[in-house]
């Protein structure tokens, strides 16, 4: 890494002046941030992210962090000789895999991120959706068309869940009390079965239940791109649905945008898809006039 360029005192003052109205806008508001993608594997970016989260809390914003862990799960499964299979973009999770998923998400990744935030001066509390029955889920299913028979088939994803209910009792004990919840996307069924939940979907459900001011989805891409691969800075829900229908939004971006739409329908005021590999992406989005990524709104 190269050293960051020097910023003059005058430029520093201008940056702070520009940030002030945004800090006032988000004062005592809840911001849910989904932290994921390959940026999680870069220690410098992870520690910079942790410092940014502490800064939000210090400026009277209530951050709630949801993290993913796909690459780390894949690495551990490979190390243990367990083959990863996917369908419709979701990891097929059998009994052996769910144990590894829970170990990596709720153990390794969650506690590492909690450690980084605490090291930066915050008071992070590591949890997963199972704690306090925070997130209840039902078994997720997907359908795919068989390429030979052209018949639609139901795909059994194993222990993969869709959020059904979010109980805010535990989160409300933390939010606004100088504590930063850091959530691993695991949930339980009514019978006590552990489910692996897509981190974007999990974050959308939590943000919707909290009626958050903003939901930020950190990804490996700059945001939603048009057909010429240029960033679309802003989209209405209507426009987003149109771009899904005409194929502009495709592949793995579709479930992300669908999560955004769901969160907005549940009362979140705005959702932004941003590039987690950009240093201080969260601060750029919240505290600068131009923002970053793609803002989706009603």
UniProtKB/Swiss-Prot annotation:
GO CC terms for this protein? cytoplasm
- A GO BP entry: arginine biosynthetic process via ornithine
Source species, domain of life? Bacteria
Its keywords, alphabetically, are: Amino-acid biosynthesis, Arginine biosynthesis, ATP-binding, Cytoplasm, Kinase, Nucleotide-binding, Transferase
Leading EC class: transferase
Location in or out of the cell: Cytoplasm
Q: Where does substrate bind?
A: 69-70, 91, 196
Question: Which catalysed reactions does the entry list for this protein?
Answer: N-acetyl-L-glutamate + ATP = N-acetyl-L-glutamyl 5-phosphate + ADP
Q: Does the keyword ATP-binding apply?
A: yes
Xref: InterPro entries: AceGlu_kinase-like_sf (IPR036393), AcgluKinase_fam (IPR004662), ArgB (IPR037528), Asp/Glu/Uridylate_kinase (IPR001048), NAGK-C (IPR041727)
EC number from the UniProt entry: 2.7.2.8
Specify the pathway: Amino-acid biosynthesis; L-arginine biosynthesis; N(2)-acetyl-L-ornithine from L-glutamate: step 2/4
Location of site Transition state stabilizer? 34, 256
Gene3D superfamilies, from UniProt? Acetylglutamate kinase-like (3.40.1160.10)
The yes or no answer to whether the keyword Cytoplasm is present is: yes
Any single GO molecular-function term of the entry would be: ATP binding
Q: Which CDD domains match?
A: AAK_NAGK-C (cd04250)
Q: Function of this protein?
A: Catalyzes the ATP-dependent phosphorylation of N-acetyl-L-glutamate.
The text of the family note is: Belongs to the acetylglutamate kinase family. ArgB subfamily.
- HAMAP family in alphabetical order: ArgB
Protein name per Swiss-Prot or TrEMBL? Acetylglutamate kinase
**What organism, scientifically named, is this protein from?**
Rhodopseudomonas palustris (strain BisB18)
